[in-house]
Amino acid sequence: ASVGYLMTQNLPADIKIRVVTNSIVIAEELRKNDNISVIMLGGEMDNKGNCYDAIAIETIKRLRFDKCFLTSACISASFGLSIQKSQAISFWNAVIDSSKQAIGLYPTEKIGIDSIVSICPANRLNTLITDWDASEEDLCQFDDLGIEVVIVDKE
């Protein structure tokens, strides 16, 4: 399961929010909650149920978000957010550009390594949320870039 999907399963039961997503899987999970309004972005869907194309990007450019939550294959202080395929670069940059606050969700295994293609520098994130196993050295590098680092406790 994706990090975003796991986040949807752990939202407080009484939260009242509107969510914009490019993922049919996440939209399907969220639509089960009466207190969550879902806007599903359109466009050509990939085999994982996500839309990253020009239609989705143009829709994103017409919206404004208080917060965006994103993840990618990897993140490092030097190479930034990175992925294996370049199709999503413009989409994720449009999401960040349309957001007041960009929050990265990165478990330990995605931190401090680089994938093939950089989406953007790490300091485009305002906040990085990770788990208790993340390397202090890696986290200090993000802190030095001015990124607020939040460590989720082990439970």
Residue ranges and their predicted role:
Residues 18, 24-155:
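Conserved phosphate- and dinucleotide-binding cores of soluble alpha/beta proteins
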Residues 1-5:
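Gly/Ser/Thr-rich loops at beta-strand to alpha-helix junctions
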